[in-house]
Amino acid sequence: MKPLNNTKKNQRGFSLIELMIVIAIIGILIGVGVAGYKSAIKAANEAAAVKTLRSIADQQMLYFNSHQRNAFGTFEEMRKENLLDSRFDGTTPVVDGYVYTMKVVPKSTTAQPGYTINADPQVATGVSATGKNHYYVDSDTNTIHVNDSQPAAISDPPIGQ
């Protein structure tokens, strides 16, 4: 009778330790990748917000000029004239992770018409943040201002400074 020997000389396959090490490495790579992906999404949303503010400001000038330089339009008025697309339906549209708020000042005997637009992240903090920076533009300066902690205003520095 032959003695029982549980070891085979040419075993094939992976041990449990080797599999656990591979799974741990994959987990680390996924964790790093997700963090980088979320950071890239935030940066893309912020770039889109700046571009969108510039576009709205340009469309406001078209609206202003087509109304005998007497008025700026709300989101709804600009949508009716096809100056903005359907993403801007409503009074506070959300586009690419940013909430846009516009205030229009009508022309009066004491003031010229004007507007201000704020673009604020839909979610400003946490894992699901859609952006960090808050942006502002108005009809007087047509310069985009930025604040990294609260809604931006004209007193905040312009982008790039």
Predicted regions located by residue number:
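Secretory/exported precursors with cleavable N-terminal leaders
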Residues: 13-21
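Alpha-helical hydrophobic helix detector
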Residues: 20-36
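Aliphatic-rich helix starts adjacent to a transmembrane/signal segment
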Residues: 34-53
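Short, exposed beta-strand-loop hairpins at the edges of beta-sheets
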Residues: 143-151
